[in-house]
Amino acid sequence: MKSDKPFLERYFYDPTLLQKGLIFALYPFSLIYQGIATIKRKTAKKHDFKIPLISIGNLIAGGSGKTPFILEIAPRYQEVAIVSRGYQRDSKGLVVVSVKGNILVPQQTAGDEAYLLALNLKQASVIVSEKRELGVLKALELGAKIVFLDDGFRFNFNQFNALLKPKIPPYYPFCLPSGLYRESIKSYKEAHLVITEDKDYQRITSISHPTKRMLLVTAIANPSRLDAFLPKEVVKKLYFKDHALFDLKLLEKEFYQNSATSLLVTSKDLVKLQDCSLPLSVLDLKLEIDPKILEKIDRYILSYPCNTKERL
């Protein structure tokens, strides 16, 4: 935990001279990582599920708005399922998190992002599985006619690949561990749709239940990206590792030490604070998406016989 910019975020986005030396020393390993990732994806067995399968992914490790994007577009359709890995959940294998809004498991079993999707998408079913093909097959079993795949670019599926591109890219366009890319930056050319922040979509934020002295508490990737949306009433920032669970006793200690009047958290963090007795303010994030982007996704979905305009 740190209250300033985390080391890894500095390393990938604003490296010091010493960190730059380390980056170039590790570059040969980045080339190996890149080669393995590309070969693994392109040589994997091809799967065709015969329904619209839309992958909302990114080339960069960590958060880039995939969950908010799915939250924004999934309600536009009927008979939808979302398939995700379920990061940092305490379960293994395939788990049905919800069926058309009926939540079947607790947050710890689902993972924070999948649980957030289940809470907000009342018309959709949410499934988590390390093996995405099993998740898609379960979605079909549940009657889904459209499936959104959270972070599915690296899978060799017959799917519509939408890649989110951040407004501020990493300092170097290298793969891990010298950079933050999981595949070559040239892979953007392989996507059906590249969706760029501030060009194809805008982030719209608001704060529910604001107070005069808010303590920011978050466990998301690249947390300093929230800085542009924070009000002056934030008295301190506490950053935790992405997807980390919160120590409620530690939060209570920091709360009183800083004379805070509420904890400011994101919607993703909120699902892990259901047992927190401290006052909570919520930083709500929504996306305003260019209609042309939505039209391209609609056209793909309508290209399948199982879907009609009435389903949109």
From Swiss-Prot:
The keyword Glycoprotein does not apply. It holds the Pfam family LpxK. It catalyses: a lipid A disaccharide + ATP = a lipid IVA + ADP + H(+). Keywords: ATP-binding, Kinase, Lipid A biosynthesis, Lipid biosynthesis, Lipid metabolism, Nucleotide-binding, Transferase. GO terms for molecular function: ATP binding; tetraacyldisaccharide 4'-kinase activity. Pathway: Glycolipid biosynthesis; lipid IV(A) biosynthesis; lipid IV(A) from (3R)-3-hydroxytetradecanoyl-[acyl-carrier-protein] and UDP-N-acetyl-alpha-D-glucosamine: step 6/6. Transmembrane segments: none annotated. Its EC number is 2.7.1.130. It is an enzyme of class 2 (transferase). InterPro entries: LpxK. ATP binds at I60, A61, G62, G63, S64, G65, K66, T67. GO terms for cellular component: plasma membrane. Belongs to the LpxK family. Transfers the gamma-phosphate of ATP to the 4'-position of a tetraacyldisaccharide 1-phosphate intermediate (termed DS-1-P) to form tetraacyldisaccharide 1,4'-bis-phosphate (lipid IVA). This is Tetraacyldisaccharide 4'-kinase. It comes from Helicobacter pylori (strain HPAG1). The lineage of its organism: Bacteria, Pseudomonadati, Campylobacterota, Epsilonproteobacteria, Campylobacterales. The gene is lpxK.
